[in-house]
């Protein structure tokens, strides 16, 4: 069972889709699925031209960039997520209001970066070993 990550911003046409596509690229060899959503999108809208340019510069395939369509943050979109990365505290608040069970799984990007900086490789290895071979269980243990 893959690890389910969601990135969240306002319109789902710049920050969260860039984060989604870049995480997919970086984590392509791992059992991870990444999606994105917006708190106030125009459903179906494409990424902005500037966001598309940045994505291309990051090495994201054109087909993936062009396939993006903005979608609204909702309970079904949040269902089963192991990690939610919000662009701002307001976005994180919107996530937790929709699904309070995500309180300990939803972070702003900055919060997640600060927290992950303090976890050592040894701690990750120990947590992973205790969780067995299931990638999702290993991720949750970490």
Label each region the model flagged.
Residues 96-142:
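Phosphate-binding/catalytic loops
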Residues 1-81, 89-93, 102:
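Conserved active-site segments centered on acidic
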């Amino acid at each position: 069972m893959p690890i389910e990550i969601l990135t969240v911003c306002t319109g789902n046409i710049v920050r969260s889709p860039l984060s989604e596509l870049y995480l997919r690229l970086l984590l392509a060899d791992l059992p991870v699925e990444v999606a994105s959503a917006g708190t106030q999108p125009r459903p179906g809208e494409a990424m902005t031209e500037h966001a598309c340019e940045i994505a291309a510069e990051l090495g994201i395939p054109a087909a993936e960039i062009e396939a993006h369509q903005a979608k609204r943050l909702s309970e079904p979109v949040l269902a089963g997520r192991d990690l939610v990365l919000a662009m701002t505290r307001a976005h994180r608040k919107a996530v937790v209001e929709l699904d309070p069970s995500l309180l300990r799984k939803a972070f702003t990007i900055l919060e997640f970066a600060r927290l992950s900086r303090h976890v050592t490789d040894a701690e990750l290895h120990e947590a992973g070993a205790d969780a067995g071979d299931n990638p999702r269980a290993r991720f949750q243990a970490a």
